[in-house]
């Protein structure tokens, strides 16, 4: 089969590699679509420490079951359409045993630490596969993984009925978070982004107001602030807009060495709550349901998928901010 092989940071090729066979407890999936996300860019640039090289990246994917190991007892017949949770937890560390699987001390992930889905086929644990409703195509199925991350983020925030929200970043994750906020009953949601086309999409998806800069909102205060940019200065800026008793969700991934200027006195005196959100925690099945029911619609975010041979072009479009969400269709 053909696959993207990243030999070292900055150097990838489309290569012929052996077809995978299902190991114990595994299925083989023909990849229908695999999304490119910020983590893939970090892996390409050598900025994701857990990643070994060479590796085939790709962790946001959906496809068709083509082979099933004999010991698999789940209802995953050949021909079934599935989305795959890429998370690989050990199940025995202190955090896994306390229900915090996403903080596993031995964390691994398909496409991040073991070869993933920028390939025609991939072998995965059967327990990571989620059946898709028949009307969900490959691209929509590949959006389940990022939506599952967003669902976990909002669960971390807690109840938000009627609360005013400012959300920074109208990329893929920001626009999924926006839809979830609206669907969950948040009060008016204001979205901030520098790209006019993305703000237009945000308005169509339910934003009550859009702004091109945090400066436009400097005299306002919000009960909830959500950052989906991962830019430290933006995190500081949006935190400054919190009202007393406000809650901040740091969702975007900042550089590890970045710090915040949020005053400890303000956290104390204004009872500010700062919350992080790491990947997925038992939110994959709810994400399947949200897309399958039509409650969340990722289609306004999607560009036409590109073939494996155009992986480099897809990366260029992601890096230069063209479109919102790009997928590779290897098969």
Residue spans for each PLM region:
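N-terminal glycine-rich cofactor-binding segment
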Residues: 3-21, 38-67, 83-84, 101-115
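Glycine-rich beta-strand-centered segment in the early N-terminal region that forms part
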Residues: 18-34, 48-94, 133-135
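NAD(P)H dinucleotide-binding glycine-rich loop of Rossmann-like/cofactor-binding domains
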Residues: 88-168
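Mid-domain Rossmann-like dinucleotide-binding core that forms the NAD(H)/NADP(H) cofactor-binding site
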Residues: 136-215
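A short acidic, Gly/Pro-enriched loop at the edge of an enzyme's catalytic core
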Residues: 217-225
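Glycine-rich phosphate-binding loop and adjacent beta-alpha segment
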Residues: 232-293, 330-331
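C-terminal hydrophobic helical "lid"/dimerization subdomain
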Residues: 281-331
